[in-house]
From Swiss-Prot:
Any Pfam family hit: CD20
Recorded superkingdom: Eukaryota
Protein name stated in the entry: Transmembrane protein 176B
Described function: May play a role in the process of maturation of dendritic cells. Required for the development of cerebellar granule cells.
InterPro entries in the record: CD20-like (IPR007237), TMEM176A/TMEM176B (IPR009281)
Family: Belongs to the TMEM176 family.
Amino acid sequence: MVQSTVTVNGVKVASTHPQSAHISIHIHQKSALEQLLGAVGSLKKFLSWPQARIHYGQLSLGVTQILLGLVSCALGVCLYFGPWTELCAFGCAFWSGSVAILAGVGTIVHEKRQGKLSGQVSCLLLLACIATAAAATVLGVNSLIRQTSVPYYVEIFSTCNPLQSSMDPGYGTVRYSDDSDWKTERCREYLNMMMNLFLAFCIMLTVVCILEIVVSVASLGLSLRSMYGRSSQALNEEESERKLLDGHPAPASPAKEKIPAIL
């Protein structure tokens, strides 16, 4: 304000003159770069689940699957030292063990990364592990039923029977007789021990396949529950953000403006 003195009828009167005032109003709007970064962040949030704490129970199930797969492959190698059975013919110990190892690795990777794609791949591997382990269990049970049957034992122990001397004029083969009964008894004892060992390997493989099914089902249940919980959490966060935006609307402006006003 500027003061001046004015004389009115011989009386000095102080008068004031208004001074121009400038008021600057700034309206800020996000730049194009900020909007681009926000869009990239939204896309990344859509493609991945929100971060959560690591479930060590899920990790332990993954490690258990890997160990069961290794044991299955080792038992498959041992089975090839025995008589030929369905387990050896189909090689179920190897493909069921390999799928179990892959499922365990997929579970561990998903628990570390916690992504949507890794979760779907992990669930598919777990389903494949359940299917292969179930097929191997069926083959193992059929093999056990056959190995515990009486005709199978008679066929195996017939190799220890004493050979009778005979001459076949058509083929010219000769079989020599062995009168020592103790050798026959000793052969049957060793053969019985080997058959029991082979039967134990088959039982262990069947049990391992059953354990693979149990562990895979448990891991699949935990994975589905975790995925459902994370999706619900993401929906709740989006709803909360929407409520906040509705409560505090942002002003719409084409660009940053500076409006001078003179009073």
